[in-house]
Amino acid sequence: MTVTLADTVQEEEPHFEDEQILARKYIETLYDKVKILDTTFIINGLTYDIKCRHFCKKDNGLTIPKKYNPDIKKDFKTNNFATKLTITIGKNIILNKTIEKSDFKNHLDTTLNRYATLLFPYISLTNDTISVNYSISIPGTDVGRAFSFRIGKDGHFVVNGM
């Protein structure tokens, strides 16, 4: 039996436009979901209780220009996201804050300041520092950067690019 090129199955690579459509649809599924990241750590006898709620602000606060949406050739209206974070050590609340894109504004370029939002949070702990890590990205695109909101055990925080 001879196999020819016509007999083989050829898989198409996904089109960039298809990926963008899926990415926008995924972002839209997050509008009504609250991501809950609650955890407890015990380090050197201290109990760290972290309550984190990442949510859509439903503010229609972002208009992504059509140049970032070549498949639909029009602007994409979407929402900002934010994180409500409460950290307790023992019985003391050391931080009770809503984290928003504005907390990172001094570290963002003009494009991310205008069109990006906080996406895909996760929590990490290194020594006595709690980090809430994000992708600050333009929804529906691969344009963005990783950032970290780091909190010390005294409740003071700093913002870092990763």
Where are these regions (language model features)?
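Extracytoplasmic electrostatic interaction patches
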Residues: I94-M162
